């Protein structure tokens, strides 16, 4: 439930080396830029006024840093990564414009501010690549593997249905294949009346043989053995995968399994969106492929 989402926890920042390093560098770069902009504003002259656009870039950069801190601290990267990527893309433009305005100047304060903007731009580019990448991509999975805090297990189910444009395939073979007939059996099956329909089947003047209609129209009383049985799990698991996020199985589906972040699973087939996996304790079931990365 959305109401049960946790608040900001510093463990999500301190336990993630990538988040801690980039946020620290970004905050340091912003402090350099902000102090240098203040000094540059004080040292401005009538012939060389301080560009006011730099203040907007400085304020926007602070909003980006705070936003990234809140998203990572609240463990909601999976939910807001698209919005964060859009804001970061706009930040690259603003910060780059600030560099262009301040770099080519004789003032040391303005050059220091431009250096801070350059450092901010580098961090924003890295953030854009991180938040804009799929969680199962190799670079992002590598960075997430160093995080100590576990990803929240309350991720909305719609993200799973939206992965690849489809949901999980059925895991039982209850669908019966269509019955095939020969040309001899279908001989005389033509309907002479354009509106006769099914009501004339088996009646007077019917073009369908009575013996054939009985065999076709009557449903089968029994299904083939094992029609509704569950799929037998495989005996070989040649692949090994590492969980990049925690996942909680659907309580209504006995085929799914739950696992925690960084847990190692054995996988039998990696061709679909849902993989047949086995945990270290011997528990087997299906797991979403975008939560795993092959080793």
Curated annotation (Swiss-Prot):
Name the domain of life: Eukaryota
Subcellular location as annotated: Cell membrane
Per the record, ranges on the Cytoplasmic side are: 1-18, 74-81, 133-295
Which Pfam family would be a valid example here?
A: SH3_1
Kindly list the GO CC terms recorded for this protein: plasma membrane
InterPro entries linked to this entry: SH3-like_dom_sf, SH3_domain, Sho1_SH3
**Per the UniProt record, which residue ranges are transmembrane?**
19-39, 53-73, 82-102, 112-132
Using the record's annotation, list all stretches that form the SH3 domain: 236-295
Keyword Transmembrane helix appears in the UniProt entry: yes
Enumerate the UniProt keywords alphabetically.
Cell membrane, Membrane, SH3 domain, Stress response, Transmembrane, Transmembrane helix
List residues in topological domain: Extracellular: 40-52, 103-111
Q: How does it sit in the membrane?
A: Multi-pass membrane protein
Q: Which GO terms describe its biological process?
A: regulation of actin filament polymerization
Q: Which PANTHER family match?
A: FCH AND DOUBLE SH3 DOMAINS PROTEIN, HIGH OSMOLARITY SIGNALING PROTEIN SHO1
- Describe the protein's quaternary organization and the partners it interacts with: Forms homooligomers.
Give the family from UniProt: Belongs to the SHO1 family.
Q: What is the recorded function of this protein according to its Swiss-Prot or TrEMBL entry?
A: Plasma membrane osmosensor that activates the high osmolarity glycerol (HOG) MAPK signaling pathway in response to high osmolarity.
- What is the protein's given name? High osmolarity signaling protein SHO1
Gene field:
SHO1
